[in-house]
Every structure is written in C-alpha cells, then in structure tokens.
Amino acid sequence: MGKYSALWEYVRKDGSPSLKLSFAEIHDIAGIKLDHSFLNYKKELVQYGYQVGKISLKEQTVIFMKIG
C-alpha cells in the first residue's frame, strides 16, 4: 500500500467527475498531512481512474478529475 492509498480509494469510491478536497480533508482521509512527496505519489492515482487536476496552495485545495 502506498502512502496515499486511503485517499486514492476515497476518490475512486466517490465516483464524481470532479472532486475538490481541502488539505485538511485530505489529512483526515489519508491520516497524513499533504507534503511535497504528494507530487510524486499522485501518479498512482491514474490506476484508480483519476488524475490530479489542480493543486491550489492559496486555497489549500486539490481538485481530482476522473479520467475518460
């Protein structure tokens, strides 16, 4: 299991075409704070049918987009 597996599962189960989560929500779901390694781990999300659409440091949010 990867560092963010719980988050990827959450996004997949949600099933929305687009899902916006705050850094705090991601912390609650994944059990860890979002850090720079997220940029490397986000590639794993493709296996779950999603990709990271936008990371906003100003708003402290991440938008996940369904592939296809």
Question: Where are each of the predicted segments found?
Answer:
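Ser/Thr/Pro-rich, acidic low-complexity intrinsically disordered regulatory segments
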Residues: 1-17, 32-68
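Alpha-helical residues within the helix-turn-helix
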Residues: 28
